[in-house]
């Protein structure tokens, strides 16, 4: 059942009705010596801390996997308001809001979602969501081909390898190519990326933080791309945008990413949602649906699906994409998540993620034979070099109920000993110390 506390005004009104001057008067008949002096209650807890305790009691010792895995999908807190509001019948539907006269609530929610994404990314226009982060990167690549009328995309190899596969798949069959540029250690090779841009380049695609967890400034790369008439596409991790410079601040033309970390739980790969935002001058090349604000014939504010001539149900052969459904419910969860935290709360969440990952980075890299591979700033994720292959080490720790990270040898040849570890705000110091102890034991055996 719901719990709605009484406001001070409501309390005063109720006391006045029963003729009492204060709440204390209600307990006056109870002798003072019989009244409880203290209830011996622990200090107040956050919603997440209380949920953790209740889950521990419910599990009664049952084993659960402790995740230190990232690679694009992350284990973050989800305020109870997200589940409660997104499950309301008004929102919980697969219906596409083509009829604005009976869809104002849904349309306004999606309009506010677009506003939140623009504020996060530093961009001017957003659509109403895409399938996931990978398809968002690929749609941005196609968008750059349309805008520049060129046929070459440069892909930084420190972009999520699964997302790079999707880009390659999207470009297959088109008269376009994706050229990969190898990273410099665990960071983007900015010099090589700049040197790869030519008159046939439609866009340069980078990720910040990248797949190794490294954070970089791409402002100079944006200038180099623009000098050659190319675009800069930045794939971002939304939680990191509470601390790091937004794609817009770096001069990017298109910002994309996976919105899973905004109020959507880990769920065997989905459903999640992808976000895409761009400069206003590129709005007619944005894929998917866009919700706009307008005025009806009676002067009332209303919301509608706008610029629909870009979409396949109007001009299929000229459509910017063939997205037959989007992830509106997941995007709504993202909006509620952002609204629940607010600007200050979002910044505090990002800082908490950064601090906990910094502790884990220091703790794990101090183990014998373990070295940190990231040269500069990291966020959430960081990459360790182990004294042995990472895959069997991860397998061993999994038997103890700990998913230690992502072995990078499966994606990058020659990096068999590299392990990408992720630490979010949900991981406690005790859990990080447990990972360190188990990792140390596995490396010594």
Curated annotation (Swiss-Prot):
Organism: Geobacter sp. (strain M21)
Lineage, opening ranks: Bacteria, Pseudomonadati, Thermodesulfobacteriota, Desulfuromonadia, Geobacterales
Protein name: Probable glycine dehydrogenase (decarboxylating) subunit 1
GO annotation, biological process: glycine decarboxylation via glycine cleavage system; nucleoside metabolic process
UniProt EC number: 1.4.4.2
Subunit structure: The glycine cleavage system is composed of four proteins: P, T, L and H. In this organism, the P 'protein' is a heterodimer of two subunits.
UniProtKB keywords: Oxidoreductase
Gene: gcvPA
Family indicated by similarity: Belongs to the GcvP family. N-terminal subunit subfamily.
Role of this protein: The glycine cleavage system catalyzes the degradation of glycine. The P protein binds the alpha-amino group of glycine through its pyridoxal phosphate cofactor; CO(2) is released and the remaining methylamine moiety is then transferred to the lipoamide cofactor of the H protein.
Gene Ontology molecular-function annotations: glycine dehydrogenase (decarboxylating) activity
PANTHER family (alphabetical): GLYCINE CLEAVAGE SYSTEM P-PROTEIN (PTHR42806), GLYCINE DEHYDROGENASE (DECARBOXYLATING) (PTHR42806:SF1)
